[in-house]
Swiss-Prot record:
NCBIfam families in the record: F_box_assoc_1 (TIGR01640)
SMART domains for this protein: FBOX
PANTHER family named in the record: BNACNNG10540D PROTEIN, F-BOX PROTEIN CPR30-LIKE
Domain annotation F-box: ranges: 1-45
This protein's name: Putative F-box protein At3g17500
PROSITE patterns: FBOX (PS50181)
InterPro entries registered for this protein in UniProt: F-box-assoc_dom_typ1 (IPR006527), F-box-assoc_interact_dom (IPR017451), F-box-like_dom_sf (IPR036047), F-box_dom (IPR001810), Gal_Oxase/kelch_b-propeller (IPR011043), SCF_F-box_component (IPR050796)
Length: 381
């Protein structure tokens, strides 16, 4: 019985159990549940435990878990299947979502900013800065401090009018529960399609002054932007989407204007972190554009072992002009399959699919400063 084992040995065993399995075990024993709440243990668990790569989807302002089965496709033994498993998480209308280190940074339709761990169910609302402006964008990142993650949020806001541009950049630090402006970080780029890797944020970007596309990284340790290279710099290529591969590499979807092809490229660096200055790329998959001409705003992830890519998009169609939610599975030898997962109103946000790695990481809570008790004055008679 594990209950008779020394506590340090129990911790060592539990630290290797996947997060979702450990979540189910927490009610088994009080000491196990205490491990679950111990920050030291959760940090050790995030390093040692086997990673689980799940798929989540933001659809109609709610997050759903997605079951994806790509087994035996190339052998024609079974057809691929994608199933929405149902809505997960708190009852809030989510308009934007960003995944980092097992945490989801959510912006809501009623203009709130929430941090949520779907694995533990923990949430925390972050109050907006007094300088907050509508249409601000937010990303979550962290800095490694002696193997501990120090979390921060970047708020960025841009205003354009003809040749006039105004930008604001603020950092929220969880440790101090406060916002502060940061200066001299303006990348002079238009950005889209942000993803998180090893605590830093990466965007697809365009430098209008130099007329080039690139990848832009925000390094949370120095709070500065850095420029990185795409696989191809030719003007006859367009960047469409960015994705993360098993928390180790980046992948990018490119559209060729000179041929009827889209291409997925994957980085091959030994590691990618804040010290990486140059990205090394290899072509992962070529896609015939004639099979996906109607794509408008895709999100995607890849399966390296099966040499396949799964795309998600929504397009307007049908008698009632509803937005059809579609998954597209594409592989080698011109393998192509469409899977319909439901309709949504036109005005709802486009579906967004992403890999999610469950984690026991605890959301830092704001420090509550107790009020000083006033001394009662004694009546002198």
């Amino acid at each position: 019985m594990m209950s008779n084992l020394p506590l340090d040995l129990v911790e060592e065993i539990l630290s290797r159990v996947p997060a979702t399995s450990l979540k189910r075990l927490r009610s088994t024993c009080k000491s196990w549940n205490n491990c679950y709440k111990d920050q030291r243990f959760t940090e050790k668990h995030s390093v040692i435990a086997a990673k689980q790569f799940l798929v989540l989807m933001l659809k109609d302002c709610r997050v759903s878990s997605v079951s994806v089965n790509l087994n035996e496709i190339h052998n024609n033994i079974a057809a691929p299947s994608i199933e929405l498993k149902g809505v997960v998480g708190p009852q809030m209308q989510i308009s934007g979502i960003f995944h980092c280190d097992g945490l989801l940074l959510c912006t809501t339709k009623d203009d709130r900013l929430e941090v949520w761990n779907p694995c533990t169910g923990q949430t925390r609302r972050v109050q907006h800065s007094i300088h907050y402006k509508t249409n601000s964008e937010f990303v979550l990142g962290y800095v490694n401090n002696n193997s501990r993650h120090s979390y921060k949020i970047l708020r960025y806001w841009n205003f354009y009018m003809s040749n006039y541009r105004v930008s604001e950049f603020e950092i929220y630090d969880f440790s101090s529960d406060s916002w502060r402006f940061i200066d001299e970080v303006n990348p002079y780029c238009l950005t889209e399609g942000e993803v998180s890797l090893k605590g830093n944020t990466y965007w697809l970007a365009s430098d209008e002054k130099r007329d080039i596309d690139l990848i832009l990284r925000f390094d949370f340790s120095i709070e500065r932007y850095q420029r990185l290279n795409l696989p191809i710099l030719k003007s006859d290529y367009e960047t469409e989407a960015l994705s993360v591969v098993r928390e180790k590499q980046l992948s990018v979807l490119l559209k060729r204007n000179d041929t009827l092809e889209r291409e997925i490229w994957v980085t091959t660096n030994d590691k990618i972190d804040h010290t990486t200055k140059n990205l090394l790329w290899i072509k992962f998959l070529a896609i015939d554009q004639r099979t996906c001409y109607h794509w408008s705003c895709v999100s995607f992830f890849i399966d390296e072992e099966k040499k396949m890519a799964v795309f998600c998009d929504g397009y307007i169609g049908g008698i009632n002009e509803t937005s059809r939610r579609m998954f597209y599975i594409i592989g080698e030898d011109k393998y192509y399959r469409e899977l319909y997962v439901g309709d949504s109103p036109i005005r709802s946000h486009r579906p967004f699919v992403f890999n999610y790695v469950p984690s026991l990481v605890q959301i830092p809570q704001a420090t509550v400063i107790p009020k000083r008790r006033r001394r009662k004055r004694k009546n002198r008679n």
